[in-house]
Amino acid sequence: MTKGLKKFIFSPFLFSLAIGGHPISIDGSFGDWVEVPIIYSDNNDDAIEADFSTLKITYDSEFLFIYFRFHEGEFLMQDWNDFHLYIDVDNDHLTGHQANGVGAELVWNFGNRSGYFMINDQQIPIMQNDIKLRVAPTITSREFEIAIGLDSPGLTLDGDQQFSNGKIVLSEVNGGGDYIPDDEGGLNFLVSDDDQTLFEPISIERYDENNIRVLSYNTLNNGIIDID
């Protein structure tokens, strides 16, 4: 069995390399992506607004990880955008949503924070938790990393298959928007069951029992201090 993730489309801007999976922490720091090879590098100045630069893909036993970067500017992935992710999970361009030469069973609209998966020509709406989606950073940035659960209905066709390979397209749908890849047909990738370095969870234990810990987080409402 072929192991790792491999790029199959050949172009001066594509790089082909078989690799094993990498455990990635979706924290917006990107240091754990250094060892993951670029599978697509896009031309500069081929878009009006959001101009994609590079794309990386890897995985562990639970998640598919995707990293992408823009040539210039900063963007907010949670709102105010028309970025779409398309994944063809059955490698059949005749099924699913038609997008730049692929038939995507999983479609995600980052700006709307929603999407759908297609099965038997029906669109099944999904939200972030349905595909275990993680996106970082949650502020404006030039680069982003995301994770999607390998057992999510969008990748398993609602449990009918174990996801092992597919094709991906990333786009800004607005007029003049950019695509990864530029050519139709998407980017092929594999998810294998090769041996992987286990992710080491970050401990939340106190270094010193005498320390006092203060936790802060963003909320939609002031539930912590507003008793109503």
What residue ranges belong to the model's regions?
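A short beta-turn/strand-edge loop motif at beta-sheet boundaries
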Residues: 46, 73-79, 154-160
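Sec-dependent N-terminal signal peptides
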Residues: 4-20
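Short, well-ordered beta-strand segments enriched in hydrophobic/aromatic residues
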Residues: 28, 62-72, 144-150
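Low-complexity, serine/threonine/proline/glycine-rich extracellular segments that form mucin-like
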Residues: 60-65, 69-89
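Glycine-aromatic-enriched beta-strand/loop faces of beta-sandwich-type recognition domains
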Residues: 107-139
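Short, solvent-exposed loop/turn elements at domain surfaces
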Residues: 32-38, 75-77, 94-95, 213, ...
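Acidic/polar low-complexity flexible segments
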Residues: 21-29, 82, 86-113, 139-141, ...
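N-terminal, active-site-proximal structural segment of metallo-dependent hydrolase catalytic domains
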Residues: 192-228
